Amino acid sequence: MQSSEGSPDMMDQKYNSVRLSPAASSRILYHVPCKVCRDHSSGKHYGIYACDGCAGFFKRSIRRSRQYVCKSQKQGLCVVDKTHRNQCRACRLRKCFEVGMNKDAVQHERGPRNSTLRRHMAMYKDAMMGAGEMPQIPAEILMNTAALTGFPGVPMPMPGLPQRAGHHPAHMAAFQPPPSAAAVLDLSVPRVPHHPVHQGHHGFFSPTAAYMNALATRALPPTPPLMAAEHIKETAAEHLFKNVNWIKSVRAFTELPMPDQLLLLEESWKEFFILAMAQYLMPMNFAQLLFVYESENANREIMGMVTREVHAFQEVLNQLCHLNIDSTEYECLRAISLFRKSPPSASSTEDLANSSILTGSGSPNSSASAESRGLLESGKVAAMHNDARSALHNYIQRTHPSQPMRFQTLLGVVQLMHKVSSFTIEELFFRKTIGDITIVRLISDMYSQRKI
């Protein structure tokens, strides 16, 4: 097999993920076409050589007993090839049978792998973020915390429960975001039903005294030890789902056109995931995660890249932990990441170059960069990005007056997150769970509440 003809770059800048060269894609049989659509096959599936797409389609159709109807007026005559294979499911399934796919091989195959994401979708379908309980965490400590993370054990607040008293400064109650942010942003976490809260006119909320007293009587779980790899993946999947619910709670975001919502979600899910890991899952057993991943992945080139990016991931988590980020700062960082003025491939110095923000319109190229990636409401997105930065800047001035560089430091950590590719997170935490489905497709379906 030809090794590196054309030598494509490992990193696809548009999607911040890995493009596999022919040498790296050892599963693809470039000389053996799929008998269904004539794309490159990946081996024998259900009795014939087929690509992953057609094999997955056949498996889902048989397991779910799908009955498709041909969309063409000429029943059963639709073209099924690489370009048109998704246009008519009835004809695609018919061709699968015609070329020899064996449905009994699907029925006698073991059931689908435990899909944490789909199970969480069922468990939390109508729940607000934080309404559910965290999965039970094993009591065994697998490795020493300080040795893995570089700092002693850090309290890990559990999502869905208030963080421990003293974790956030008392001056948080005095925070008032700037009026410019109030007019556009609603960054408050989703309201938990049946708990009275005092809603300020700025969109942030602070609990009433009665609510705080009620929470004080609620037993908080102990700080969990380092989790086993499978439990890290389980909890990571739950946070992925809760991130989607958090995004749904941001009023200004949901008022954007749906294509803009999906594009921004696709570009920011990675930063949301990293922030959730820092806020709720430190310290994390990366050593075991890498060990498990290496045992399942024989490609040394990919393994080396994932290992390097894990170090960048750990560096981001360490910095966020040492900065003692409070919940308001985390919300502002999420909003800054969500209302991204430029795609991830843009200059990584944009935020630092604009770190002396006031409440102006931002850099002159921000709207153009937003338009170039297809945003329908690029002006609104740029304005909300600036307002989120203003909210963070003014909050830090009020609450950390002795740390004049804190704002720039936090924006620097946001830029550092770009060093961790979506591919690495997808491979390390979700590949075994989601199979051939891309994480972007899965998140988009979750957000749109479409059945997967």
Curated annotation (Swiss-Prot):
DNA-binding region residue numbers: 31-108
Low complexity bias locations: 360-371
Biased composition (Polar residues): 344-359
Top-rank lineage group of the source organism: Eukaryota
UniProt xrefs under InterPro entries: NHR-like_dom_sf (IPR035500), Nucl_hrmn_rcpt_lig-bd (IPR000536), Nuclear_hormone_rcpt_NR2 (IPR050274), Nuclear_hrmn_rcpt (IPR001723), Znf_hrmn_rcpt (IPR001628), Znf_NHR/GATA (IPR013088)
UniProt-recorded Gene Ontology molecular function terms: DNA-binding transcription factor activity, RNA polymerase II-specific; nuclear receptor activity; RNA polymerase II cis-regulatory region sequence-specific DNA binding; transcription corepressor binding; zinc ion binding
Chain segments carrying region Disordered: 342-371
UniProt family annotation: Belongs to the nuclear hormone receptor family. NR2 subfamily.
Function in brief: Orphan receptor that binds DNA as a monomer to hormone response elements (HRE) containing an extended core motif half-site sequence 5'-AAGTCA-3' in which the 5' flanking nucleotides participate in determining receptor specificity. This receptor binds to the consensus sequence [AG][AG]AAGTCAA. Plays a key role in the establishment of non-metameric domains at the anterior and posterior poles of the embryo. It may also play a role in the nervous system.
Subunit structure: Monomer.
Name of this chain's protein: Protein tailless
Gene assigned in the entry: tll
